[in-house]
Amino acid sequence: MRSAQVYRWQIPMDAGVVLRDRRLKTRDGLYVCLRDGEREGWGEISPLPGFSQETWEEAQTALLTWVNDWLQGNEGLPEMPSVAFGASCALAELTGVLPEAADYRAAPLCTGDPDDLVLRLADMPGEKIAKVKVGLYEAVRDGMVVNLLLEAIPDLHLRLDANRAWTPLKAQQFAKYVNPDYRARIAFLEEPCKTRDDSRAFARETGIAIAWDESLREADFTFEAEEGVRAVVIKPTLTGSLDKVREQVAAAHALGLTAVISSSIESSLGLTQLARIAAWLTPGTLPGLDTLHLMQAQQVRPWPGSALPCLKRDELERLL
């Protein structure tokens, strides 16, 4: 016997979270909980403002329609990426497809004073991989900060993310301030320039490896082995169903590319599922999931070791 609940939620964010020039004051989303007999599965639907095609309200309408269809015995998935991902996660838990084993390691997101970062990163146990957002300030400053971190910590590798912020000139200004001897320890730089051709040229000219992120969601993108391209960054909330995520990971691996499962600032429930997906589909590759600290609370399922308060399901607004 099938049954389902849908919950709506809103989590206050830390004051400094800015996405595409918009301050993100709250993270808004939905949960679906599916039951079939004794089995249960959860999924999170949380479109990311400025990045998702769909709004929270559109996702809610699509989710409620899909849940009612599922209760009638239909097995298809919705089209909207965030709804398809959340619904497929709930089904994967319900059927036991999504393994319980998780990779709760996270490449720490580096913000704040560079001198403080050096101290924090130097004390990191094990493999030292960290992420730095670039393109928010002057390119020269970004280059100097990256160079400082790589110089101060000889075993540090950095993942950089520019979100297509730079013109070719700005990208070259950044590279000019990174010692060529350190560039091999830039694991990859996500989408440095506004166009793929400019990003490819940057990689060829500087020897700094790049990764595709936004490109994966463009209609004309195809997976290819290209000079200077080392990785793809897959954000399941923006991608679609678990099957589509699996297809992208498999396509990347077939070309020898690194596939990184990455957060779209999901709640703790969604992040713990992404940690399981990463352990399942990209074992041995550190996922990019260090976003929980941007929020003021957890929900339903806590992230191991987090001190943030965790709301229970009966504290959420139920829609169905």
From Swiss-Prot:
Mg(2+) binds at D161, E190, D213. The active site is at K133 (proton donor), K235 (proton acceptor). It comes from the Bacteria. It is an enzyme of class 4 (lyase). Pfam families: MenC_N, MR_MLE_C. This is o-succinylbenzoate synthase. Its cofactor is a divalent metal cation. It comes from Salmonella agona (strain SL483). The lineage of its organism: Bacteria, Pseudomonadati, Pseudomonadota, Gammaproteobacteria, Enterobacterales. Pathway: Quinol/quinone metabolism; 1,4-dihydroxy-2-naphthoate biosynthesis; 1,4-dihydroxy-2-naphthoate from chorismate: step 4/7; Quinol/quinone metabolism; menaquinone biosynthesis. CDD domains: OSBS. It catalyses: (1R,6R)-6-hydroxy-2-succinyl-cyclohexa-2,4-diene-1-carboxylate = 2-succinylbenzoate + H2O. Its EC number is 4.2.1.113. The gene is menC. Belongs to the mandelate racemase/muconate lactonizing enzyme family. MenC type 1 subfamily. Keywords: Lyase, Magnesium, Menaquinone biosynthesis, Metal-binding.
